[in-house]
């Protein structure tokens, strides 16, 4: 099956891709990584109005849904653009529906938000933070986008129930310690609450986190799709330029087969990702299966594409000066971001009717 986008969706994808080509070239990305500060990119993205795409106008957005967000994530992955603040805000924003002032600040003014869950696990897994007398206590390891967030949505689990709290990240009782990641285009930090004041949000915590898990699965898969697509193009271009025995290495059958395998993987991943995004947006009974399949299959496929692309390039592909290393590291991190393929395959298997009946 081949997924066909609507004309408006194609126009959005192409417009965002053109914008990224102008504002997030490989040279610009390296500059931000060298400086350790992607703030200029985040600020420009907010100023040019891209943060509101995928959210309703009532919430302060510009319309669209999860499929539009997936198209944006795909292009961010294709450019290896800094994406931690964007993805963190996208996952936190639905929890802010009861606080339209904060929601508008995030989507319209670019005040970054983050969901205080560990980026190593699906967002709906219980966390360590507890609430006592309206104050938060505990440490959450590796929170995506926390370093630059102004608003933190903090899940507190008790007796199987989840309450979401909103905290200002700049509170003195909240400390953030940055973590080093293989892929420096994303950022994460350990967040410690030592009696931090917070207010509960009027939201169904379990439902919000369950939705966040599905959205995270789809959007990380879309990012991997974009990275894999870019690595395919880099590998094909390099195989046309690099010569061995007096001919381009792209003329060798083994290289052709490797490139063809990557192409099939990219196109199948595209259909899986788009279908999962549409399914989660519509909220069907099998949307969880589709999201799990996308996260498990697409991120694993992108990892394989990264290895193939690096093999075709040789050692030069991992040097700082070559673009391939940006996408290689991105694909590798995506496989672990919000749960490994194994974790999502287990969720997929446990939800199948054959196993549910046992």
Per-region residue spans from a language model:
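A short core secondary-structure module
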Residues: 139-174
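Active-site nucleophile and cofactor-binding loops and adjacent substrate-binding regions
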Residues: 62-63, 82-89, 106-107
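N-terminal glycine-rich flavin-associated loop
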Residues: 83-101
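Cytochrome P450 C-terminal beta-domain/meander region
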Residues: 125-137
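A generic structural signal for well-ordered coil/turn residues at beta-strand boundaries
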Residues: 111, 124-125, 148-150, 161, ...
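A short, Trp-centered hydrophobic/proline-enriched beta-strand micro-motif
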Residues: 108-122
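Alpha-helical interface subdomain recognition
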Residues: 1-77, 135, 214-358
